[in-house]
Amino acid sequence: MPLKPLALSLQWGRFDAAAAQRSALPRHLIRRWIRHALTTDAEITVRIVGADEGRQLNRTYRNKDYATNVLTFVYSQAPLVTADLLLCAPVIEREAQQQGKHLQAHYAHMLVHGTLHAQGWDHEGSADADAMQARETQIMQALGFADPYARQPG
């Protein structure tokens, strides 16, 4: 299946490890990971933030007083997906370490996950969660990554 066109805007919040994260996440990889998850044309802004901004936005928009790995804000879906994906760098880094995953692999997974949300996928019920996880695994493996839901050794 051909990759869909993507207008990508990439923003970096102010946080301690922003420079290191930026060098580990070149724009062309972010674009590639998102495009593999798209089934329609898209305009997506990716903003990578620190814990304070991530917590504030999660509290404001989801009434949850903690920073989470990815938030998806959808403005339109087919025929053109328009969305913002907010990734919280410290949460993603901590999760990657805890799960024994390479940092880029976990970022790719969170971008795929958020992009699927932008297209209407969710994981509210167990059937939806199973379907979404299967799709994420398929995309991640097509990108050359391991199944993100496989148990890590150790």
From Swiss-Prot:
Binds 1 zinc ion. It comes from Verminephrobacter eiseniae (strain EF01-2). Belongs to the endoribonuclease YbeY family. GO terms for biological process: rRNA processing. The gene is ybeY. Pfam families: YbeY. NCBIfam families: rRNA maturation RNase YbeY. It is found in: Cytoplasm. This is Endoribonuclease YbeY.
